[in-house]
Amino acid sequence: MFPMVTEFMNYGQQTVRAARYIGQGFIITLSHANRLPVTIQYPYEKLITSERFRGRIHFEFDKCIACEVCVRVCPIDLPVVDWKLETDIRKKRLLNYSIDFGICIFCGNCVEYCPTNCLSMTEEYELSTYDRHELNYNQIALGRLPMSIIDDYTIRTILNLPEIKT
């Protein structure tokens, strides 16, 4: 056969194959069009966090015995515990406790191993600031309880995500 005719036949086959691939992609796109959206409108809708969510650490100053277990179990030696030994009663007195959440990896080891349960994980995960030095929380900032998402009337909470079918 003539080379021009065979090239034209190959061109036709390639065109049909390309149209088939485009059609298959279009069918997949149309099958996803009737599904519910997966995203939520973040500032106005928030998911309720799970029971064991590891958010910001809450600290209770009165319960702390300055044993420094939290510092020893932390993989990055993050909590700063300042204490003074009271010689008359032979006990440590806690002076200062701080955690830098810019460095914290939220592993929860400090909460898990604390013998007096003065540390706990909260639901708070919005810790963004414009200055990284504001992420260094002292015992006063760590002692504040976060506002619960459930109690905030300006935010619509979503109890659970719709199941995603694959």
UniProtKB/Swiss-Prot annotation:
Its cofactor is [4Fe-4S] cluster. Binds 2 [4Fe-4S] clusters per subunit. It catalyses: a plastoquinone + NADH + (n+1) H(+)(in) = a plastoquinol + NAD(+) + n H(+)(out); a plastoquinone + NADPH + (n+1) H(+)(in) = a plastoquinol + NADP(+) + n H(+)(out). Belongs to the complex I 23 kDa subunit family. NDH shuttles electrons from NAD(P)H:plastoquinone, via FMN and iron-sulfur (Fe-S) centers, to quinones in the photosynthetic chain and possibly in a chloroplast respiratory chain. The immediate electron acceptor for the enzyme in this species is believed to be plastoquinone. Couples the redox reaction to proton translocation, and thus conserves the redox energy in a proton gradient. It comes from the Eukaryota. It is a peripheral membrane protein. Coiled coil: none annotated. One of its GO terms (molecular function) is 4 iron, 4 sulfur cluster binding. [4Fe-4S] cluster 2 binds at residues 74, 104, 107, 110. It is found in: Plastid, Chloroplast thylakoid membrane. InterPro entries: 4Fe4S_Fe-S-bd, 4Fe4S_Fe_S_CS, NADH_quinone_OxRdtase_chainI, NDHI. Pfam families: Fer4 (PF00037). NDH is composed of at least 16 different subunits, 5 of which are encoded in the nucleus. This is NAD(P)H-quinone oxidoreductase subunit I, chloroplastic. Keywords: 4Fe-4S, Chloroplast, Iron, Iron-sulfur, Membrane, Metal-binding, NAD, NADP, Plastid, Plastoquinone, Quinone, Repeat, Thylakoid, Translocase. Residues 55-84, 95-124 form the 4Fe-4S ferredoxin-type domain. It comes from Stevia rebaudiana. The gene is ndhI. One of its GO terms (cellular component) is chloroplast thylakoid membrane. [4Fe-4S] cluster 1 binds at residues 64, 67, 70, 114. Its main location: plastid. Its EC number is 7.1.1.-. GO terms for biological process: photosynthesis, light reaction.
